[in-house]
Amino acid sequence: MAQQLIKAFVITSALFVLASCGNSVQDEPSPADSTDEIDEVEEPTPEASAETDPWSIDAEHFTQTETVDGQEVIQNPDNVAVLVNYEYALPEGYEPEDLVVPDVTFSFDEDVEKRYLREPAAIALESLFEAAVEDDIHLFAVSGYRSYDRQDAIFSNAAAERGEDIASETIAYPGNSEHQTGLAMDVSSESNNFLLSEAFGDTPEGQWVEENAHKHGYIIRYEEHKVDVTGISYEPWHLRYVGEEIATMMVEHDLTLEEFFEKATAI
């Protein structure tokens, strides 16, 4: 009788264990029965990329060139951030279509081409000059847009007087001048006798320009400590419009336009 009871107990226990195991298997959802959705991986948007990469700028700001007779000729000269230097040249016949006369004080009265700037640069220059007056600083515009032919005449005369190598240290070859873009303006002051000279950088007006130009989208294109990068002697009077965003980035990181585009990425 005892053996029968033990046998019955063992059988009952086994059935209980099997029943428990069966319930455990059913409680575990199979992959096919799972209703959980897998989150899709989203591609980063241009806005998100710009937030994570501080050097991101619109692709349209990069200079596009094509090799013509061994010279890199710019194909998008209307780009306000266009890089013009000894390596990258503007098309010979290029003339901006939006040239206007900025409403600022000039050092001369004649209505000649150097009075003009491209419209975005002209508006920014007006803002710059107005801010200067508010700080009791009085600037004078001296030389803006310059055609290819005019630059050719200026360089040829300087080369004849001083030699081509010496002339090229301060005067760009025709096609390689930022003045042809309509985005550059040379400025001076009465305290500097309206001259375009290094001494302007030591005047109150020149120091104000160095500290504030970028707030209005302008940079001092040829800095004294960057001659080895630009290949151009120090020109505290030469202001180049590139837009507030790029100008601020350049000043904050002490970069020339050449150095900036080595770091910048397109979005």
Predicted segment positions?
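Sec-dependent N-terminal signal peptides of Gram-positive bacterial secreted proteins and lipoproteins
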Residues: 1-26
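Extracytoplasmic cell-surface/polysaccharide-interacting catalytic and binding patches
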Residues: 21-143, 148-267
